[in-house]
Design a protein with these regions (language model features):
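Short hydrophobic beta-strand segments
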Residues: 1-10, 264
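A binding-site-centric feature that preferentially detects glycan-recognition modules on secreted/surface proteins
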Residues: 5-6, 15-16, 109, 114-115
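Short, solvent-exposed loop/turn segments at secondary-structure junctions
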Residues: 9-10, 51-53, 83-86, 99, ...
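Catalytic beta-strand/loop cores that center a nucleophilic Ser/Cys/Thr
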Residues: 114-209, 217-221, 300
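Hydrophobic/aromatic beta-strand patches that form the interior of the parallel beta-sheet core
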Residues: 28, 78, 156, 214-216
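A glycine-rich, often tryptophan-bearing local segment used as a flexible ligand/cofactor-contacting loop or short
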Residues: 53, 57-140
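Helical hinge/lid and interdomain linker segments adjacent to catalytic or ligand-binding clefts
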Residues: 9-91
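Extracellular ligand-binding/catalytic regions of CAZymes and related secreted enzymes
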Residues: 198-200, 209-406
């Protein structure tokens, strides 16, 4: 049995859910309050990406202590990105390392695949990848602060070189020649080369009592993509699940994922209408050049556009429609169905207006700066989408209703 801590996960929770469901391993989706009140059992706790701070707040002191007890008594903890950050010294304290700060915001805006050197001699690394280079995906990662002494921490992977689909903010890294990057640094003081590439640690592991943990700023749960090597992260995750959860050995890679093509098992009019309206918004944003395709499950976005929230809503609505409407889900959905319908109608109208206004502001930026005040756009954005890092807004209200149904 795998427990998945859901709080503050959004699209990263749905990505992990897709990976775990594909294996057939029994799982439970839990909130921090559930863990604090009823404890943990089973073999593994998996924590998806998202805000580590908000996950810690959801667990509270009692939930955090229960996670530590679970691992000390033989459980396994696997955390990706924000789930990795949660387990560091200033969080759960499973790993003695700390999170490294970033003074340059651009260094956080890195997404796509990186070539990573994998260690030799660790049972947690698949034999066919041990000591080799693998393509591992990162999606706006934090990073470990590596001390001079490892303090019982084993580095499993280090970043080495950019992969074929790497972006910095909304710019494909492959489109930026080295001489231009050097020129920008000299002329503007802007450094777009990710400092992660300076052989920083990507994934680490260690023990705690009778249990163990694996923390990765690479999202190993990322589905296979459309280029060679994109299956390697999933192969690593499946190896860990075989080792720690007894997954049968015949599964070698995670299946692809297209949220829009998930089967519809819950034919609810309100949910279906919401999906149709959201797809209309996404099409409008693409037409305006504010969103663009990244891969089969993710849309990229221009800087300043709330792409994370659009992606999370798409994942949430599509996944909810793919679930069976059992008694538990219906008992949660029925009392909030009308609330969701009304809130989504407000969101649709507001988001459509904001997307068009944002595009107009871009058009007027040179010829008539200030005609459409950026402060007003920011206020509207916060009301609809909240903070890019910490959520909120009308979109989070919708996500909270949908995430109860998982």
């Amino acid at each position: 049995m795998i427990a998945i801590l859901w709080d503050a996960s959004h699209i990263w929770g749905y990505l992990l859910l897709h990976a775990v469901r594909s294996t057939g391993i029994p799982y439970r989706v839990l909130k921090g309050l559930d863990i604090a009140q009823t404890g943990l059992s089973g073999k593994m706790l998996m924590v998806p990406g998202g805000s580590a701070r908000r996950k810690a707040e959801a667990l509270g002191p009692a939930g955090a202590e229960e996670v530590r007890r679970f691992v000390r008594q033989g459980g396994r903890y696997v955390g990706f990105c924000g789930g990795a950050g949660l387990a560091l010294a200033d969080g759960l304290g499973l790993c003695p390392w700390k999170r490294d700060g970033m003074t340059d915001r651009l260094q956080h805006l890195v997404s796509g695949s990186l070539c990573c050197d994998l260690a030799e001699g660790s049972e947690l690394i698949p034999p066919h990848l041990a000591g080799k280079t693998a393509l591992l995906p990162v999606w706006w990662p934090g990073r470990f602060s590596e001390p001079d002494e490892p303090d019982g921490v084993e580095v499993l992977a280090r970043y080495r070189a950019p992969g074929p689909d790497l972006y910095v903010a909304d710019m494909p890294f492959s489109s930026m020649p080295a001489d231009i990057l050097a020129e920008w640094k000299s002329m503007y003081g802007v450094t777009l080369r990710p400092s992660l590439l300076d052989e920083r640690p990507c994934a680490v592991s260690g023990s705690c009592g009778r249990g163990g943990w694996l923390l990765s700023y690479s999202h190993l749960e990322t589905p296979s993509g459309n280029f060679p090597g994109s299956e390697q992260a999933g192969a690593w995750l499946l190896h860990v699940l075989r080792l720690w959860c007894g997954l049968p050995s015949d599964m070698t890679e995670l299946p692809p994922l297209e949220f829009d093509r998930l089967p519809v098992l819950w034919e609810d009019r309100v949910l279906l209408d919401a999906r149709a309206s959201l797809l209309e918004l996404l099409a409008l944003a693409e037409h305006l050049g504010l969103l663009f395709p990244r891969n089969s499950w993710l849309l990229g976005w221009r800087s300043g556009v709330p792409g994370a929230q659009f992606n999370s809503l798409n994942a949430a609505i599509s996944t909810t429609l793919s679930l069976r409407p059992d008694d538990r889900r219906l008992s949660l959905w029925t009392p909030r169905r009308k609330e969701f319908e009304s809130a989504f109608a407000l969101f649709f109208q507001g988001a459509r207006s904001w997307l068009l206004a944002r595009r107009l502001a871009d058009t007027l930026a040179d010829s008539a700066p200030g005609m459409l005040p950026r402060e007003l756009l920011e206020d509207q954005r916060r009301a609809l989408f909240g903070s890019p890092m910490f959520g909120g807004g009308l979109s989070e209200q919708l996500l909270n209703i949908l995430e109860e149904l998982v």
